[in-house]
Amino acid sequence: MTNAPDTHVMAQRPRWRLFLRVLAARLDAVLDADQRDALLRDVGADMARGAALPPVSTLDALEDEINEVLSDLGWGRASLALDEAARVLSIVHTHLPTIGSIEGRRGPWLSAVLEGLYTSWLAQQPHAAPGLVARRTARRTKDVLVLTYGKASAMTDSPS
């Protein structure tokens, strides 16, 4: 038996966790929560442009395209459901990596990035209405985040 590390297992491990925790701490130190979230939404929007989704004609196809990119990122999965009565799209995102700052609690620090990512991806689709945004509306468990895509004026305060 050898004590050599299993390179396949090592390749599967996240290698950015310490960097992201230190970056989170630095951002938390120089920005208030609203500024930090705005910056992270912009990062998500930039990511959406870098990983643009093809135009699709069904919600199921959109969910598949989103999940393909999320899988490549190692950022979990999304389930999409249209709430016709409320005129919003519900996004249930599971298994987002939990990154917090060194000093802060661990949690969905990257959720603001998801807001920008989903806002931009959905806006890129054919027949997308202008001015709609994705915002966190609930957290069911540590690794389940619910976002709503709709008019900003209809959104309630989002949980941190």
Functional labels for PLM-detected ranges:
Residues R136-S158:
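C-terminal edge-of-domain segments
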Residues M1-S90, H95-W109, D157-S160:
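N-terminal accessory segment detector
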Residues E84-R140:
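Short, hydrophobic/π-rich interface segment
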